[in-house]
Amino acid sequence: MLERRYIYPGIIEMNYQAGHRLGCNIYLIDGGSEWLLIDIGYEDTVDEIIDLIRQMDFPLAACKTLIATHADADHVQGMTKAQDILKTSISGHPLAVEPLASGDPVMTYAEIKAQDIFVEMKPCQIDTLIDEGDIIQVGDKQLEVWHTPGHTNNQLALRIDNLLMSGDNIYRDGCVGVIDAHHGSDIPDFIQSLKRIRDSDISWLLPSHGPIFKKENALLEKTIERLSEYQFMSDFGTCAVDWPLLQAWDREITEGRYPKIEPMRTD
């Protein structure tokens, strides 16, 4: 049996578990009697992820659901393959249904012609709709669903205790998920989602890309100010050629450096 590397009681991040970067961050929520996955990444890493789950001695039949934080291909391209293996349901926001069902290459960010990016996005069916305020019970764990639009209109975040699996809302370096009108991004909505995170009692952010990090309101405020300026900049756009955070992330994973988050005190 492979040792389970919990970053917090009941939470395993599969990149940390693997010791190398598989793609987007994939969170396994261990509720004891059952478990679920938040995102799955690309199809070509599904077999490795499920093999890791087997090696950690999680019964595959005990997978409650696969949650799509949003409809982007880098998070969900492997969903149908994983569903076929695990014989479970796929859960996501109502606004993710159509782009996933149609495999829309623009709305799922599977195709970016200007950057010569193309990922085959097979149609994917959401079985269970989840939205703002819903509670997902998985064994002895509860996840609270937040709808945090901005990067996409179907972006979800999931709260457990004082941790937020925050999707593509913000990363450790203050960057945010790509903003693209063709992809359904909305800057005013994004600002409101970031303000909600800033004003919450969340202590730790578990993003969909890059390292887990402690919530710092100064970082959030700086990002909010930057996005507020974007609303009035006609030259706004992103054609980034590199993202140094992912290089740092690679080093931290391979060196086994990851945060050990203390359980939330209830007294």
Regions found by a protein language model. Give the residues of each.
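Metallo-beta-lactamase
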Residues: 35, 42-44, 135, 142-149, ...
